[in-house]
Amino acid sequence: MDDPNLQDSGNNIDQEGVNYLIDAALEMGVNYFDTAPSYCRGFSERALGEALSRHPRDKYYIATKLSNFARSTWSREKSMEMYKASYKELKTDYIDYMLLHNVGQGGFDQFEKRYLKNGMIDFLAE
């Protein structure tokens, strides 16, 4: 899928274009959609959620991620904010796959600080 940001418009999304692409994808049998809070300048989850919310929820799967880019998001509180925001932006009661973004970067020490010590792995496993 091409970048749905409108040319020369900052952070505006061509929602009509996103809707068209999602409708066409679903019609052709695509049922898995992967996104992240950081995609499309931070607007991907919202645009995808808007497009998919027009279809029955049992017809597709959503994958999104907990970001690993900004250390300011590593606390449990910030991680939970990111987690909850994904549900809101995606307009869904459940997310099929909650992935951990960029796990290998920084090695095990960074992984431990980002996902283990703040309890997010335990939370996601529940």
Located regions from the model:
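Structural preference for beta-strand elements that scaffold enzyme active sites
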Residues: N31-Y32, K59-K65, Y94-L99
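Short, charge-rich binding segments
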Residues: E50-H55, R71, K88-K91
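Active-site beta-loop-alpha junctions enriched in small/polar residues
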Residues: M1, A36-S38, K65-F69, L100-V103
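N-terminal binding-site loop/beta-alpha segment at the start of enzyme catalytic domains
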Residues: M1-Y60
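Glycine/proline-rich, positively charged
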Residues: G10, T73-E126
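Conserved short-loop catalytic and cofactor-binding motifs
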Residues: L6, A36, S67, F108-E112
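Short, surface-exposed, polar/charged, turn-prone segments marking secondary-structure boundaries
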Residues: N19-A24, Y60-I62, E89-T92, A125-E126
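Secondary-structure boundary/capping motif
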Residues: S44, R71-W74
